[in-house]
């Protein structure tokens, strides 16, 4: 399957690092380094716009190396790029680490994962919902954090 991309000057196509990778790396399309202080966030351009076919989305996810080594994650991960969006994909990076993180021009900053999606009809009901073993147990309902 082909997804057509429009590239701004200096940007490059998303790339899969290995033949088995689910996510394609995207790079920072910036001219100068950007410093993200601890506890802060920054919106980083990729220079990529994508024509996503109907029935698909692109999920923007953190790179595990940035998260584990520096505490830098994609905020609102996964971020969703809808099929009808035609603008530049930009990545919100958050620094949860203890040191300032420098985003360098061309640095791999996130991964794009393609996923199938389906729109459904949400229908209000006055009836009880079907019972399950979990029931209404929400966050931490298993007692494990």
Curated annotation (Swiss-Prot):
Record-linked InterPro entries: dUTPase, dUTPase-like, dUTPase-like_sf, dUTPase_trimeric
A GO biological-process term: dUTP catabolic process
One GO molecular-function entry: magnesium ion binding
CDD domains to which the protein is assigned, alphabetical: trimeric_dUTPase
Known EC number: 3.6.1.23
Cofactor(s) required for function per UniProt: Mg(2+)
Domain of life of the source: Bacteria
Enzyme class, spelled out: hydrolase
UniProt xrefs under Pfam families: dUTPase
SUPFAM superfamilies xrefs: dUTPase-like
Reaction catalysed by this enzyme: dUTP + H2O = dUMP + diphosphate + H(+)
Residues bound to substrate: 63-65, 76, 80-82
Gene3D superfamilies reported in the protein's UniProt record: 2.70.40.10
Pathway: Pyrimidine metabolism; dUMP biosynthesis; dUMP from dCTP (dUTP route): step 2/2
Function, as annotated: This enzyme is involved in nucleotide metabolism: it produces dUMP, the immediate precursor of thymidine nucleotides and it decreases the intracellular concentration of dUTP so that uracil cannot be incorporated into DNA.
The family this protein is said to belong to: Belongs to the dUTPase family.
NCBIfam families reported in the protein's UniProt record: dut (TIGR00576), PRK00601.1 (NF001862)
Name of this protein: Deoxyuridine 5'-triphosphate nucleotidohydrolase
Organism per entry: Chlamydia trachomatis serovar D (strain ATCC VR-885 / DSM 19411 / UW-3/Cx)
Lineage: Bacteria, Pseudomonadati, Chlamydiota, Chlamydiia, Chlamydiales
């Amino acid at each position: 399957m082909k997804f057509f991309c429009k590239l701004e000057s200096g940007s490059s196509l998303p790339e899969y690092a290995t033949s088995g990778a689910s996510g394609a790396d995207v790079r920072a399309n910036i001219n100068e380094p950007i410093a993200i202080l601890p506890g802060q966030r920054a919106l980083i351009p990729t220079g990529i716009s994508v024509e996503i076919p109907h029935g698909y989305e692109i999920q923007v996810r953190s790179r595990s190396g940035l998260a584990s080594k520096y505490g830098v994650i994609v905020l609102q991960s996964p971020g969703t790029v809808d099929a009808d969006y035609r603008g530049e994909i930009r990545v919100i990076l958050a620094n949860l680490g203890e040191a300032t993180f420098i985003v360098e021009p061309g640095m791999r900053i996130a991964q794009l994962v393609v996923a199938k999606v389906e729109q459904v009809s949400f229908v209000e009901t006055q009836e009880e919902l079907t019972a399950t073993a979990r029931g209404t147990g929400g966050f931490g309902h298993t007692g494990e954090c």
